[in-house]
Every structure is written in structure tokens, then in C-alpha cells.
Amino acid sequence: MSFDGMFTYGMTHELNEKIMGGRITKVHQPYKHDVIFHIRAKGKNQKLLLSAHPSYSRVHITAQAYENPSEPPMFCMLLRKHIEGGFIEKIEQAGLDRIMIFHIKSRNEIGDETVRKLYVEIMGRHSNIILTDAAENVIIDGLKHLSPSMNSYRTVLPGQDYKLPPAQDKISPLEASEDDILRHLSFQEGKLDKQIVDHFSGVSPLFAKEAVHRAGLANKVTLPKALLALFAEVKEHRFIPNITTVNGKEYFYLLELTHLKGEARSFESLSELLDRFYFGKAERDRVKQQAQDLERFVVNERKKNANKIKKLEKTLEYSENAKEFQLYGELLTANLYMLKKGDKQAEVINYYDEESPTITIPLNPNKTPSENAQAYFTKYQKAKNSVAVVEEQIRLAQEEIEYFDQLIQQLSSASPRDISEIREELVEGKYLRPKQQKGQKKQKPHNPVLETYESTSGLTILVGKNNRQNEYLTTRVAARDDIWLHTKDIPGSHVVIRSSEPDEQTIMEAATIAAYFSKAKDSSSVPVDYTKIRHVKKPNGAKPGFVTYDSQHTVFVTPDADTVIKLKKS
């Protein structure tokens, strides 16, 4: 658990520095568990994300763009009514718990000044956002309701008194002394990191393991010294926001994690750190839920076509025996005088072989020798004719597999909007039936929205995240001399640089984006082709997003999320 009480302490300090006194100009709720405040503070506009997501609960300033629903949810409307236009007086933490309290001064409908408290409880699947009347300590409403039958200790319903979750009887690390540490830790019992978590509030196993590691040979001298030093780093706001990667797994924290042997990357702020760490994670989780049926359908269709090819290849194998059937027919015709009806096989010399071996030809005893010869000629003709048909069916099935591979890749990096476009594409392709509900008007066709990036040198880079977007970008948006990029022989996004002569750095940055939004996202040294749009063609009758191209150059890049985040325009 990286977002522990100590991290909450650090984030509370950071937000007070950045947005205290700021005005909440807009409130949005893009997703079920996430609320965004647009805040004007310290002379600039900032976005604050409050998330009660069961897996990704957090609070931080964000630079990410969020798509809002056409109709705001009820909780969003309630927040707009009570705190939109209000000022954030201060932000505090409940003890060292993972609870942040926003004090917001606003005015009600008749112009009277009001003070609201917004509690953000960062507690995993029990996370919540609760608005209260500060004067009465009464709940106005919560993102999630908690009835007495669900929790006997506290109720989260409108009109009920707000009650903090039960406090744990632990020592505050920020006030702890060496005596406190020695009094509560038993060096004989072992598992010192667990003891630290059990006795000190706001401390996670990650923090405790770091303390034990810094103590070296942990004893009554070294461990208190290491703990007090870490407590002081937090108390004095000497943060080193970082993400450390060990064997592909990422850990974030506000202090350096020397006990983890991996690659560490530092950030300017805790908010920037969380923006990077959670980039795409929560959205991918939402997409996974929305696209479960689509993913299952696409994978099944791919599997069907793969099985179809296996069967067709067996048919082709049989068809390729056509020459043998022809040989049998000719040899039987040449030896009719030796055969009679009722024979089960014929022993004949193969005159077409230089060594003239004797071969055995199976016969149908119910047929005359001439009828047996004709049966083999019929088999030969049928097999010969079927080869072309079977080969064409294999080609079509292979095209289907490539198409579904492309969709699988697109689903892996899709946004909720992308999902609906992929669904529409499958409906238009007659793969799925339309989900038209009773009384629902058919939506007018709309142009896809493309993701926009800006290179270090200021050039615009556009990205298609699904076949509809790819086709729209490549065939309608891009100019003839714009630069088009795509991973070489790997399913991925179409990427366009809006320039005829981009600098080398822009080409490499656009190639990195193309590799990131491809099936080779987790690979290194990925080949990316680039050419001018004039050299990119869509064959007649090709599936959406399929193109051919020539006159290309190839660069090799390693996909990098940090580059993608840095270049994305919010």
C-alpha cells in the first residue's frame, strides 16, 4: 500500500501549497467513482482529481483529460449546487489516517455564506467522498451510501451525523520518541516491519520495510535511529516522489525506497508522480468492464477462423493428392486388360517413374476396371478444382484473423469512447447485431475524435485508436505530404505528423507513440515505418483501417509511457 497515511500527509501538504485559497470554478464527474474540480488558484487553472475507485482511490492534481458524460450524475449535481464557485479555505488530514478534509466556503441560493466539509476517505473498496455541513456536522450526501444494516458503527446517508471511521490506538510517528519506539518494539519476536505497522499510525508495510532496511543490522540503536530519520523526512516535507520498478512491477512513494533493488524515477511533485503511476490504469479497468462482451466475441471469432484454417489445410492436403488420383486413373486405363470386376486392388508397374516400381492401387470390387479408372479421374478433377477454392478460403480466414488481431490490440489501449466506436464498426461489418433499445433514436453519424499530441519542437501528432479513427485520420484528415507512421508488420495505431518535413526528434517521438499504441507495447527496439500520406493507399473492398504503403523508411524505438504522457495535449 503506497498511498498510506504518510503519503496522505505529504499530499495534504502539497495541495495546501498549490490550491489553498483557490476557487472551484467547475465540478465534473466523468466516471462513477471519480470527481474533478476545476480550480483557479495561484494565478493558474488546475484540475483536482478525487477518486473513490475501489482499486485506484487517490487525490491529486492531474494534467490528464477526462471525458464527461452528456448528463451529469446526481452526486455531481449536488456538489455543483453546494460548492461550485466556493473557495478552498484549507485542507487537513484526519490524524494520520488516509482521510483528507476539504474546508470549502461558499454561498447558498439566497446568498448566505456557508461552510462545507468534503471528506475524501481513501480506503480501498470502502473509499468514499462525503459532503457535510460544517456547522452541523450533518451529511448532505455521499458518493456511496452506507446503511446501518451494512455497518453498525457508522451510517453514510443524507441527514445523518458524520462520523469518522473508528480510530486505531496507535502512536503518531510524527510525535514519536526513541523511548516510544523501544517500548513498543520487541527485538526478540522478529518481524520488526510488521511490528512497526502494528504500533505506528499511517505507516504501511512499504514504509516499515524501508526503515528496517536502512537500520542495517536492526537493533535497539540502529532501528530507532532509522525510524526517527524517516519520520523527520516526512514531518519536514523532505519528499522524494518516485516510482521504483522491480521485475516489471511498479512501486510509488514519497520517500526514496532504498530496499527495492530496481530502477527508480523521481518526479517534481506527488501529483505528477500519481498522474504517471495511474496513467491509463483506472481507465483500462473501466474499459475492461465495458468491453468484456466485445473482447470475448473478438477472441472467439479469431479462434473460429484459426480452427477453420486447420480444417481447410487438411482439405488442401487431401486436394494436393490430385496428381496421385490422376496417376491411378491413367495406370488403370493402361492395364484394363489385366483387371476384372471384383478385384480389390491392382498391382501395376508405374511407367512414369524412372525405376518403374510396382505399385498397389485400391479398387472398388463393385465397379468394373473402367469405372474404377473413371472414379479416380473424377477424384482428380474434383481435388484439382477445390485447391483454388480452399486456398481462397484460407486467405480470407487469414484476413479475418489479422482483422481480429487488430481489434484485440485496439481493445487493449481503448478509452470508453473508443469501445463504442469499435462496437459500431462490428455492427456495420455485420458481425454484431445493433443494440437498439425501444424508443431510442438512431444516433447521427459523427466524426471520430482523435488523440492529439505535441512534439518537443511544437508539431502536432494525431493518433487513431481504432479502425474508424485510423481510417478517418489517414484518408480524410491528413494532408498528402503529412508524415504517416505505423509499426512494421505489427497491429497498431495509425499516427500522423502534421508536417511535410518534421525534424528527426519529432519523427522519433511519433514513432514512440506508434509503438506504444501497438501490440509491441511491452517490447523493445520496435520497428516503425514512416512515409508520406501520398504513399498510403486503401485497397478496394478492404476492411476498415487496412492500408498498404510504399516508399517508407524504418526507425527502431522502445515504447515509453513517460514520453507519451509528456507529449499528450490535455
From Swiss-Prot:
InterPro entries: NFACT_RNA-bd (IPR008532), RQC_Subunit_NEMF (IPR051608), RqcH_bacterial (IPR043682)
Disruption phenotype annotation: Bacteria no longer adhere to fibronectin or collagen, decreased biofilm formation. Bacteria no longer inhibit binding of other bacteria to fibronectin.
Pfam families: NFACT-R_1 (PF05670), NFACT_N (PF05833)
The organism's place on the tree of life at top rank: Bacteria
Record PANTHER family: NUCLEAR EXPORT MEDIATOR FACTOR NEMF, RIBOSOME QUALITY CONTROL COMPLEX SUBUNIT NEMF
Gene3D superfamilies: 1.10.8.50, fibrinogen binding protein from staphylococcus aureus domain like, ibrinogen binding protein from staphylococcus aureus domain
Protein induction: Expressed during exponential growth, decreases in stationary phase. Transcription is down-regulated by AbrB and DegU in logarithmic and stationary phase respectively.
Record's subunit section: Associates with stalled 50S ribosomal subunits, binds to RqcP.
Any one GO BP annotation for this protein: rescue of stalled ribosome
GO cellular component, one term: RQC complex
Homology family: Belongs to the NEMF family.
Keywords on record: Cell adhesion, Protein biosynthesis, RNA-binding, rRNA-binding, tRNA-binding
Descriptive protein name: Rqc2 homolog RqcH
Record's function text: Key component of the ribosome quality control system (RQC), a ribosome-associated complex that mediates the extraction of incompletely synthesized nascent chains from stalled ribosomes and their subsequent degradation. RqcH recruits Ala-charged tRNA, and with RqcP directs the elongation of stalled nascent chains on 50S ribosomal subunits, leading to non-templated C-terminal alanine extensions (Ala tail). The Ala tail promotes nascent chain degradation. May add between 1 and at least 8 Ala residues. Binds to stalled 50S ribosomal subunits. Plays a role in bacterial binding to eukaryotic host fibronectin and other extracellular matrix proteins. Wild-type cells inhibit binding of S.aureus, L.monocytogenes and E.faecalis to human fibronectin in vitro, bacteria with a deletion of this gene no longer do so.
GO molecular function: ribosomal large subunit binding; rRNA binding; tRNA binding
